[in-house]
């Protein structure tokens, strides 16, 4: 059943089917965990070179089977379009000198696709990573298999609500027992996401 916590002097219960904890007019709703355990999935993280979602410049993937991380993959990617914006560089530290000789996305995805076949994908703020994947499929005119995405950001909001100062990846990872020391390295972020998913999904 959903559980409500008053953050502003009011109390409200939304019922067991409510999905998100939100803050409105001083009300912050927190939900108790009712999640089962997702034991088979692929956690994925993209970093981009610029504001275009197709401009993926690195990818990290962690394969989880039976609740155990059994495989991982990381690659730099030659971005499309091929330019870097300063705010992206400031986030992940990558630049054209890092990806000038990197493989293009189709060559990288050819290695990833067999690893994730039949698995749901998990990402933190899945709308971003799913958007990147769909955009780069369009750019290279690749078939989109329509991967099913699960979002650990949404799961954190459901489970922790206002008990956390924020629901950023490093914050949620720490609560779930993972020390994310290389935030915005795609593989480190995918590993953190996998740890969160094992706790919350």
Question: Can you say where each PLM-predicted feature lies in the sequence?
Answer:
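Conserved beta-strand -> loop -> alpha-helix junction used to position metal-binding or nucleic-acid-contacting
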Residues: 143-157
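Acidic, divalent-metal-coordinating active-site segment for phosphoryl/phosphodiester hydrolysis
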Residues: 185-198
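Conserved non-catalytic scaffold segment of RNase H-like nuclease domains
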Residues: 31-147, 162, 166-184
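Short, Lys/Arg-enriched N-terminal segments with co-localized hydrophobic residues
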Residues: 19, 23-37
């Amino acid at each position: 059943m959903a559980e409500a916590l008053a953050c502003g002097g009011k109390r409200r219960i939304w019922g067991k089917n409510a999905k998100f904890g939100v803050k409105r007019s001083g009300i912050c709703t927190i939900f108790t965990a009712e999640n089962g355990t997702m034991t088979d999935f692929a956690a994925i993280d993209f970093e981009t070179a610029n504001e275009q979602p197709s401009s993926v410049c690195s990818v990290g993937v962690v394969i989880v089977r039976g609740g155990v991380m059994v495989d991982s993959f990381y690659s730099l990617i030659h971005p499309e379009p091929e330019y870097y914006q300063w705010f992206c560089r400031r986030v992940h530290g990558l630049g054209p000198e890092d990806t000038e000789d990197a493989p293009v996305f189709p060559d990288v995805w050819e290695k990833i696709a067999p690893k994730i076949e039949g698995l749901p994908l998990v990402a933190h703020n899945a709308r971003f990573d799913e958007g990147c994947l769909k955009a780069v499929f369009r750019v290279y005119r690749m078939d989109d298999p329509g991967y099913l995405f699960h979002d650990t950001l949404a799961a954190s909001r459901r489970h922790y609500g206002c008990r956390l100062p924020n629901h950023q990846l490093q914050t949620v990872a720490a609560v779930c027992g993972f020390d994310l020391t290389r935030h915005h390295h795609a593989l480190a972020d995918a590993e953190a996401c996998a740890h969160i998913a094992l706790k919350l999904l």
